[in-house]
A protein has these predicted regions:
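A structured beta-alpha segment of the ubiquitous adenosine-cofactor-binding alpha/beta core
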Residues: 17, 55-106, 287
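Conserved PLP cofactor-binding pocket of PLP-dependent enzymes
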Residues: 297-320
Length: 360
């Protein structure tokens, strides 16, 4: 079917209906960026304002009250000609309106419907109230974040929503691929809880195989291989054990190796047992240097070190600029142009379509 969409884009010619809140707006944004025609269905009187504008780049929008029969009839007609529906209502809500997958799949057997909910379409928690905080807590994310002596902490931002949106986009693409061979759509069930737990595979697998319970250890990486250290003018992500002899020689050249030149420290097991002492010595050393000094020389020595970049430093990143990561888009509600994150994935033959509908 010939529809709007950039020719050559991965999803050019596909139509997506968007019935999501902040749990799923990013999913349909990615589909729009890949060339799909995304129609966002909003309640009358409601519109997406900043900070959610960036999650709705490239989408068209219609207002429709799907709780009333006239709006439901219009939505069914939209679904009849759609390829994908992404929604994030509580389980059972759309079914009660006659807009659930069983009914819509009768109207359009090729429809792929992705539902992003707190706990999925079944299970004992299905109807429980939730949010990003709940998903982070129940999914184990909070348990492993924070200092050893502090209570569990939540990572910054709505991480469960971002994870769910990405997994949902993958699920939609897989369902569309399956439709090419089967001719039929299917229901993609996305659970925030499961998305968070899936992202903790390294923590869970260690427990399954070794019985090891992950502990909160601040900025120290779970494998003890990396840690964040303070410098004179910021912070650096620092590898602790790679090329140990080279690192100690560097400290010694600055007169700050202390006892790390002793033969006993060449043993990795000994270093792991006395990690606190190594951290103390390294911290005194990093505080004597700027971030740029350590990163520049460290990279020359092939250490995987990096500045812990502030927001302003991210915006000024030459790497992101050279790869055209940032896009400027004029928002219809204000007429002002703003900079937004662009495509995290670049395809050599299928360019992303970022924000093109916002300027029409």
């Amino acid at each position: 079917m010939n529809r709007q969409g950039d020719k050559g884009s991965v999803l050019s010619g596909y139509r997506v209906l968007d019935l999501t809140d902040d749990k799923g707006m990013l999913c349909s944004r990615y589909l729009a960026d890949m060339g799909a025609e995304v129609i966002r269905v909003e309640k009358p009187g409601g519109s997406a304002k900043s900070p959610f504008s960036w999650e709705n780049l490239g989408k068209r929008a219609v207002t429709l009250n799907i709780e009333l029969e006239p709006g439901q009839e219009v939505f069914r007609r939209l679904a009849e000609n759609a390829d994908v529906l992404v929604e994030s209502y509580p389980p059972g809500y759309l079914e009660a309106l006659g807009l659930g997958y069983p009914r819509l799949s009768q109207i359009n057997p090729r429809l792929v419907m992705a539902s992003i909910t707190a706990f999925g379409q079944r299970g004992s928690y299905r109807d429980d109230k939730s949010c990003d905080l709940v998903a982070s807590a129940l999914g184990g994310q909070m348990y492993v974040c924070g200092e050893a002596e502090s209570p569990p902490l939540k990572p910054f931002g709505s991480q469960s929503y971002y994870l769910a949106a990405i997994f949902a986009a993958i699920g939609v693409m897989l369902a569309l691929w399956h439709r090419h061979t089967s001719g039929r759509g299917q229901h993609v069930d996305i659970s925030l809880l499961e998305c968070v737990a899936a992202a903790l595979d390294h923590v869970l697998v260690r427990y399954f195989y070794q019985g090891a319970v992950a502990k909160r250890q601040g900025s120290l990486y779970w494998s003890n291989a990396f840690r964040i250290f303070p410098c004179r003018d910021g912070h650096i992500l620092f590898s602790l054990f790679q090329q140990w002899e080279t690192l100690v020689e560097w400290l010694a050249s600055d007169g700050m190796a202390e006892d790390l030149t002793d033969e006993k420290w060449r043993d990795r097991g000994y270093r792991l047992q006395h990690l606190d002492h190594i951290i103390e010595v390294l911290e005194r050393w990093t505080k004597s240097h700027t971030v740029a000094e350590l990163v520049e020389v460290g990279q020359l020595m092939r250490f995987p070190w990096a500045e812990v970049a502030s927001i302003s430093r991210i915006l000024a990143s030459p790497q992101l600029k050279e790869r055209d990561f940032w896009v400027e888009v004029e928002l219809p509600e204000s007429g002002k142009r703003y900079k937004f994150p662009g495509a995290p994935v670049k395809l050599s033959r299928s360019p992303w379509r970022v924000g093109i509908d916002n300027n029409r």
